[in-house]
Design a protein with these regions (language model features):
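Short beta->alpha junction loops/turns
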Residues: 33, 63, 83-84
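Short acidic loop-to-beta-strand element that houses the catalytic metal-binding Asp/Glu
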Residues: 64-80
Length: 113
């Protein structure tokens, strides 16, 4: 992907998000998240930064109000960290998001390539 196409992709992803949630390349978390959940989000963001990708955390989609753990704006992928959610809940969540979703278990090693 050339530089222009990459920027268009990033802009398209940003347009899906509420204006107040367009803080790129910033790790955000809530006090309700476990340490394992926060650490996994950090590992994902760290790898995305190494790759030179733009990302958003805790971003809210404008149309649905859904909140994503981490969005890779370069690849249009949502990373959702889970600990106790059941498979049916994860599948419903994946069907609701406007982008591809990859579920990552908290407490495990992040090994995307």
């Amino acid at each position: 992907m050339n530089k222009r196409d990459k920027q268009l992709q990033r802009n398209n992803i940003a347009q899906l998000l509420r204006i107040s949630n367009r803080n790129r390349n910033v790790l955000k978390w809530s006090p309700n998240e476990t340490i394992a959940h926060i650490n996994m989000k950090f590992e994902i963001c760290k790898q995305l930064k190494i790759w030179g990708h733009e990302f958003y955390t805790e971003a809210i989609f404008a149309d649905s109000g859904l909140r994503a753990d981490v969005i890779d704006a370069d690849e249009a992928i949502i990373y959702e960290v889970y600990q106790t959610e059941g498979e049916d809940s994860l599948m419903r969540k994946a069907a609701s998001y406007p982008l591809e979703v990859r579920f990552i278990a908290a407490g495990q090693r992040f090994e995307e390539k």
